[in-house]
Every structure is written in structure tokens, then in C-alpha cells.
């Protein structure tokens, strides 16, 4: 589990995003987008159990070398921001990508794209490359991974 320096949980277990998810999350105030964020960031899981998650943050992850060799390294086309979405998505398509709440690390989230127009441009530019790779609106892989995740959470299944 990744926590902030003040001890609060960083909600880094997520569904594979749609362009709409990322737009809402980035540009609408939390008071308006809370319901969508709760589902996208899997709040209902409680972040207190081992669970399958198709998109895990790149700030802290362990990967099997054999799996990494099979699915490939980070995609160099987008160095910053969607690289962890792409890698964990490719891993989740062949392996279980799993959140373990029993290990805790502290991460000071920089949120550079919220503080700098240049970094916001880099973020947007790389997201365009990501969605060009996987599909903007019609993405069966995203749909299937997200359905699997939500179904497992609804059933209370753990890994």
C-alpha cells in the first residue's frame, strides 16, 4: 500500500482509464466527480485486501523478470505518465496484477502536471500516444479488464 507522508492512503489501485475518466479526474472539482473517482480508484475495495487490479501505479511495484521479458518493458513512446498504465495493463492481460495491502511504502506524490503547464502538456501529449495505441473509445481489452475487476470486487473475491 502506498501512503502519503501524513499517513493517508494514496488511491493508486485503478481501473484501466477511458479518456473520459482522465478528463473528469483532472479538470472537474472533486465535489462533482466523487462518484466517478470512487469507482475508478476502487474505493469500495477498502484497500484492505489482496485483490486483482488492472492498473497499478509505477511508483512502487514488483514484477517477475520472466513476465516482464514476455510482455516487454515500459513503452518508450510515452516516457512519463501513462507508462505505468500501459505496463500493468499488458501484465494484467497475461498475469494477475495484484495489490498487496500488507506492505506499506511512503510516497510523496509530486503531481507535477497540476503545477506546471509544461508538465500538463507532456502528460496530455503522452496520453494521446497511449490512447492512439490502445483505442480511444472502443477498447475491448480495457472493457474486459475493468469488468473482471468490478465483478471480482462485487463477489468479494480475493487473489
Predicted regions and their residues:
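Short linear elements at protein peripheries
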Residues: 38-62, 146-159
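Short, flexible, basic/aromatic active-site loop/helix in glycosyltransferases
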Residues: 17-53
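Catalytic donor-sugar/metal-binding loop of nucleotide-sugar-dependent glycosyltransferases
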Residues: 51-52, 59-61, 65-79, 85-106
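Conserved donor NDP-sugar-binding/catalytic core segment of glycosyltransferases
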Residues: 1-15
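Residues that scaffold the ATP/ADP-binding catalytic core of kinase and kinase-like folds
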Residues: 12, 22, 26, 70-71, ...
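Active-site-adjacent helix/loop segment of glycosyltransferases
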Residues: 86-89, 93-159
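Short, hinge-like loop/turn segments at secondary-structure boundaries
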Residues: 13-19, 115-118
Amino acid at each position: 500500500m502506498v501512503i502519503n507522508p501524513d499517513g493517508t492512503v494514496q488511491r493508486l489501485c485503478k481501473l484501466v482509464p477511458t479518456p473520459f475518466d482522465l478528463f473528469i479526474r483532472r479538470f472537474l472539482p472533486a465535489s462533482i466527480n466523487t462518484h466517478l473517482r470512487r469507482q475508478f480508484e476502487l474505493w469500495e475495495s477498502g484497500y484492505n485486501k489482496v485483490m486483482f487490479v488492472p492498473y497499478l501505479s509505477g511508483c512502487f511495484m514488483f514484477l517477475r523478470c520472466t513476465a516482464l521479458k514476455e510482455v516487454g518493458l515500459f513503452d518508450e513512446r510515452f516516457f512519463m505518465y501513462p507508462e505505468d498504465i500501459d505496463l500493468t495493463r499488458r501484465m494484467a492481460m497475461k498475469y494477475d496484477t495484484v495489490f498487496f495491502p500488507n506492505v506499506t511504502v511512503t510516497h510523496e506524490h509530486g503531481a507535477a502536471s497540476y503545477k506546471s503547464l509544461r508538465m500538463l502538456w507532456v502528460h496530455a501529449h503522452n496520453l494521446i500516444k497511449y490512447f492512439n495505441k490502445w483505442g480511444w473509445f472502443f477498447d475491448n481489452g480495457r472493457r474486459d479488464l475493468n469488468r473482471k475487476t468490478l465483478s471480482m470486487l462485487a463477489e468479494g473475491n480475493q487473489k
